[in-house]
Amino acid sequence: MNISLKGAIFSTVGRFNLPKVQGFIRWNSTMKSQQPTLFSEVASLSSTFKNSLSRAGFEKMTPVQQRVLNEVFPNEENAVVQAKTGTGKTLAFLLVAFKDVLKGKPRLNSSKIHSVILSPTRELALQIFEEARKLTYGTGIRVSYAIGGNSKMREENAIRRGNANLLIATPGRLEDHLQNPRILESLSTDSFILDEADRLMDMGFAESILNIHEAVTTTKTRKLCFSATMPPKVSNVFRGILGTDFKLINCLDPNEPPTHERVPQFVIETKLDKVFSSSLSLLQQLTSSNPSSRIIVFLPTISMVDFVGGVLENHLKIPCFILHSGLTTAQRRSITESFRKCQSGILFATDVVARGMDFPNITQVVQITGPSNTDDYIHRIGRTGRAGKTGEAYLILLEQEKPFLNSIKHLPLKRATIEPLSDQALSTLRSDIEKSSKFSRTNALKTLYGSKPHVFSGSSQRRATGKNIHESAIALFSLHDVPGLMEELIYKSRGRGSPKGFRGSQLKYPSSSSSSFQRRPRSLPSRGRYQQSRR
């Protein structure tokens, strides 16, 4: 593989420390040696689920499963569990949910929902749903989901007809459903579980979660919160949900460095008009050196994922997949499952897979252009080097994005160079770009501008070279023949929208794509208020 390293430009400094959480009970990460380590040894786990776990190939518990099943599962305690993704926490909280659903066998014949699990993204919710469906086969438990991008009416009908004892949902969609009093009446929640709580907070769902909690839980509801990190904004929500009476279980190994400190990381600097050729050269070299490569490629926008993935897959010899929030739920499920099962492949994606999604054996993560912030960078590279496996991370960085390196100078990052494409390969790539529709190229370019105002802004330092930046961007997408595009990009970069009366290529372009949006939380009726209104 012809990727040369020019020596470490950054080195690890110190250790990432979680902020202390005021008012929380002392961390306790000590494993009790007398705790069972096999599912078959857990006395409080029913034979039904022991058989289901055995059929699914689960025998030995991971540390987080061991802690939850021995310390939380037998009791009715509320708990906060700090654990990284990829440690088996999904199975741990599903078994708790199953137990709460099965408190009384006759309840399976009722039309009530007895357990609610909230997930930050559709992809993660579907992943939890698939795992739950496999484990509940033959148990009588009915599992359903409520997520955006799906038919709301179909979900409502499934809930009202009693097709769910366990509901897995995203906050926005569940808020929509809870505006319907009949849906609220279907809830008799014995357990309320938050997965990836820190990401739920990052996505602006704090108030929504508190509203949902007030609407669907009672004082008898068991509450579990799972989170990889514990920043103050997360602990504040936990207090609102759990109060002060809960168990805190820390499953982080204090001796294990975080993924972003131990995974080898490389930065490849490139000119704007050479981003695609540099990306293709890197991917070709990675896959040729390891035919079993499983790579996730992150891009900043939906349109960029569609365009870059669509062009580059013609030049790569292993299966390629595209995943983002613009696809239907059925498409996303199919793509996720296909990539998870393939022996080798490349997944082009937005940040919908940066956290929570568990794809096994990812050999490399590649970021094409810099992320929005340090947290995004860290979460992206966290997709590789999981479960004791090795991995690598590559960052293809624009010259104008060099200041970003200052924010990750504490990480083990090295500078690398790659062999340029041959003249013939470069000509073929350029031809494929030109064969793409002007609409897809122009829309990808515009969303790239929207995602990187710091690169394309018309600040005083850049005005002298600003035109060169826009020319490079147009050259990248082979769009020199779009009338007025240069003028529009210059106006956009200065925060002025489009020139008055400008019609450009006279194509109608959709507004800038975004992989997620934040909804304004709505006030939901609490269970008590709803019951009073019914009277």
Swiss-Prot record:
A cellular component term, taken from the record's GO annotations: mitochondrial matrix
State any GO BP term from the record. Answer: regulation of translation
Cellular localization per UniProt? Mitochondrion matrix
Q: Pfam families, per this entry? A: DEAD, Helicase_C
Q: Where is this motif: Q motif?
A: 38-66
Q: Map out region (Disordered) in residue numbers.
A: 495-535
> Per the record, what are the reactions this protein catalyses?
ATP + H2O = ADP + phosphate + H(+)
Q: Does the keyword Mitochondrion feature in the UniProt annotation?
A: yes
For this UniProt entry, which segments traverse the membrane? none
What family does the Swiss-Prot or TrEMBL record give for this protein? Answer: Belongs to the DEAD box helicase family. DDX18/HAS1 subfamily.
This protein is called ATP-dependent RNA helicase mss116, mitochondrial
Q: Which organism is it from?
A: Schizosaccharomyces pombe (strain 972 / ATCC 24843) (Fission yeast)
